[in-house]
A protein has these predicted regions:
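Conserved, structured core segments of small domains
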Residues: 1-100
C-alpha cells in the first residue's frame, strides 16, 4: 500500500533545524529509516511517498513526523499509473451496482 504523506512543521521547528547540525543529522537519519519512495520539500511543506504492508508499519514510519517535525501529517492513499486501469475498472464495477 502506498501513501502520500504531507506535513507542515511549525516555523520554530524549521528555524531550529536550520541552525542545528545535530538536529539536521537526526532528521536525516529519521528520513532514511522511513525509506520513502519519493520526497519533495518546499519552503513550507514536505511530501513523502511511502510503501507499507500494514497500518502499524505506516505508524512506525510516520512517527518522526509527529515527534521530530511536531506536525500532524495528512495521509492520502496513492497508487502508480500501472495500477490505474485496475482501479478505474473496479470503480466502474462498483458504480454499476448502484445504477450508475
Amino acid at each position: 500500500m502506498k501513501f502520500l504523506v504531507e506535513f507542515n512543521p511549525p516555523i520554530d521547528m524549521k528555524n531550529d533545524m536550520e541552525k542545528s547540525p545535530e538536529l539536521q543529522k537526526i532528521v536525516g537519519e529519521a528520513i532514511e529509516r522511513m525509506k520513502p519512495l519519493a520526497a519533495w520539500f518546499t519552503l513550507r511543506y514536505g511530501f513523502f511517498v511511502v510503501d507499507v504492508n500494514s497500518y502499524d508499519e505506516l505508524t512506525r514510519k510516520l512517527a518522526p513526523l509527529f515527534h521530530l517535525f511536531k506536525s500532524d501529517p495528512k495521509i492520502s492513499p496513492a497508487f502508480g499509473l500501472d495500477e490505474f486501469p485496475k482501479l478505474v475498472a473496479t470503480l466502474g464495477e462498483e458504480a454499476r451496482k448502484y445504477g450508475y
